[in-house]
Amino acid sequence: MMSVRPKTSQTYGHQDHRFCPTCGGPLEDGHESGFLVCKSCGRISYLDPKLAGAAMIEINDKLLLVRRGIQPAYGKWSFPSGYVNRGEQIERAVEREVVEETGLVVTADWLVGLYSEPDKTVVLAVYSATVTGGKLIAGDETLETDTFPYTQLPDLAFNGDAKIVEDWLGGRAKR
């Protein structure tokens, strides 16, 4: 089962915070906490992590993966995933991201785990999910979708992806 969309160029880049989100004043080093502080209003700019969600989806005894159409890891295989919007329930965010990236409607069933790495800005909540509808496509942020046998996965996009697969398979075996 495979779906492909046309190639499009994507750009990506992180910008350092340079201005205060409260007053627009310049941020500078020097606060005792190690974080940036606004020179104008004194607000400390904490660089809190961003929450993302991902789905582990089984289709015909295979794992659904998406080939990423955005950075980071453009062109690499990973799980349908994306950021949780402010005020959004994590499970609903996972379900929304799956629809956006694959066209499939899913229900987030159980939490596989929470994953983070030192010096990374993202905390990833991974759920096992069941397909309840939709049609498999490659969404706007996805180059293609495909299913793979668990023992024959392609090279995965991120360092922690293999551990996530291992945890998911272990969790499935216990259910």
For each of these PLM feature ranges, what is it?
Residues 6-10, 58-100:
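Conserved Nudix-box catalytic region and its N-terminal flanking loop in Nudix hydrolases
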Residues 7-15, 27-32:
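Short, flexible, mixed-charge glycine/proline-rich loop motifs
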Residues 17-19, 35:
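Residues immediately within or flanking Cys/His clusters that coordinate Zn2+
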Residues 26, 30, 41-44:
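Cys/His-rich metal-chelating microdomains
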Residues 28-30, 104-113:
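A short coil-to-beta-strand element that immediately follows conserved catalytic motifs
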Residues 36-64, 83:
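Conserved N-terminal beta-strand and adjoining loop/helix that marks the start
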Residues 48, 115-136, 150, 169-172:
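Active-site-adjacent beta-strand/loop module that shapes the phosphate/pyrophosphate-binding cleft
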Residues 137-168:
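NUDIX/MutT-family hydrolases
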